[in-house]
Amino acid sequence: MDPLGAPSQFVDVDTLPSWGDSCQDELNSSDTTAEIFQEDTVRSPFLYNKDVNGKVVLWKGDVALLNCTAIVNTSNESLTDKNPVSESIFMLAGPDLKEDLQKLKGCRTGEAKLTKGFNLAARFIIHTVGPKYKSRYRTAAESSLYSCYRNVLQLAKEQSMSSVGFCVINSAKRGYPLEDATHIALRTVRRFLEIHGETIEKVVFAVSDLEEGTYQKLLPLYFPRSLKEENRSLPYLPADIGNAEGEPVVPERQIRISEKPGAPEDNQEEEDEGLGVDLSFIGSHAFARMEGDIDKQRKLILQGQLSEAALQKQHQRNYNRWLCQARSEDLSDIASLKALYQTGVDNCGRTVMVVVGRNIPVTLIDMDKALLYFIHVMDHIAVKEYVLVYFHTLTSEYNHLDSDFLKKLYDVVDVKYKRNLKAVYFVHPTFRSKVSTWFFTTFSVSGLKDKIHHVDSLHQLFSAISPEQIDFPPFVLEYDARENGPYYTSYPPSPDL
């Protein structure tokens, strides 16, 4: 009680239930490992561990109110950021905190620095700076965010701190996708507690209403509360779970040592067949970047963490979740762009799908919703053979899909998309887009290379698809007539595109 007799606003972390306590029914189950896991069943890389779960707390509330050894403040490089977490900490800590911060002379992204807690219940504040997120620099952002969590925990260990209260380090204003950031946060904390956590008794994740659902969904993947939950969670783990410390792994930067140096590696020979929508990569800036998803998956297989069958099952479940969401989400804003639509059939009777590059304002739309819309439209189309016509006509840098988005789309979609795609007609390519496509199909998705046909004029396209079978955006017709001359006196009517 404070001097006025009012109850304290601060919350003692020892009074909060641990993550493990939230699933007592399953924890008390009499099922044994042998009963749940068959002899050839692959165990999760994040095993059920009662002791680790007892150290973790998920709490909805203000991190500044926690009574623990240290709380975490997320800020900017000058430690002057005005976000809800920082403002609450500064208000409760008092003016002495600002004076102390001036002595630190800032903090670089990924670093962690220590000050006293002053008027807070926590003895210390650990300040860190989360990365600004841009999808083209995703790998760097992942590494920086990992460093934030890792350096906070390392500092806590060096200072013999028994309890740490984490805010969500990836602040909304820095643009980091919450779910991606949560994966990094949880796996980093899990690995640290396993390897270095002997002196740390409590780690609290203090979250808001908006963040709680994501943490509730992902915590079972990294902190399963029972053998059953461990088994259920395995298919939902992402392909990249980091190294032994939870640090993001970049396959193309790893030195690979082959058992037989003179022999070709299987994992460089086997590539999935190309996915039609990857033609959207055409014109993307990062054409020389080689993505390593297949390598990541095979790395897990070699480590004995996932079998091929488990990977296929995991992929199918993941796709089904996207499909269910696509069917329930309101995607009218994406549909109104008229960037993807079905038209007629080609000369072989295969369905023709059109992608209009100029109608994709990449910087203005939610790309996750764009992915959902693609799945919503294409799921029933891809069950049989189809072709894609991509109009690159008059696109600008604001219409070029990021390679990371295309990589994500490639990872998500079902195998039928790749198997039944028979041709991609890339209309009105530029020199840059041709080079981009060559690099992408040579190094990343080799199965797509033979399916792409660059088409410089509509006249060339008509040798494969009759003009009556395609709905053309008016600006495509105008551009082609201006550049190549009018080959036809009339074209089929077009929708209002």
From Swiss-Prot:
GO terms for biological process: response to retinoic acid. Residues 253-263 have a biased composition (Basic and acidic residues). Residues 252-273 are annotated as: Disordered. SMART domains: A1pp, SEC14. Gene3D superfamilies: CRAL-TRIO lipid binding domain (3.40.525.10), Leucine Aminopeptidase, subunit E, domain 1 (3.40.220.10). InterPro entries: CRAL-TRIO_dom, CRAL-TRIO_dom_sf, Macro_dom, Macro_dom-like, Macro_GDAP2. The modification Phosphoserine is found at residue 280. Pfam families: CRAL_TRIO_2 (PF13716), Macro (PF01661). Keywords: Disease variant, Neurodegeneration, Phosphoprotein, Spinocerebellar ataxia. Residues 43-223 form the Macro domain. The keyword Transcription does not apply. GO terms for cellular component: lysosomal membrane. Residues 333-481 form the CRAL-TRIO domain. PANTHER family: GANGLIOSIDE INDUCED DIFFERENTIATION ASSOCIATED PROTEIN 2-RELATED, GANGLIOSIDE-INDUCED DIFFERENTIATION-ASSOCIATED PROTEIN 2. Belongs to the GDAP2 family. It is linked to Spinocerebellar ataxia, autosomal recessive, 27: A form of spinocerebellar ataxia, a clinically and genetically heterogeneous group of cerebellar disorders due to degeneration of the cerebellum with variable involvement of the brainstem and spinal cord. SCAR27 is a progressive disease characterized by gait difficulties, eye movement abnormalities, dysarthria, and difficulty writing. Some patients may lose independent ambulation. Additional features include spasticity of the lower limbs and cognitive impairment. This is Ganglioside-induced differentiation-associated protein 2. It comes from Homo sapiens (Human). The gene is GDAP2.
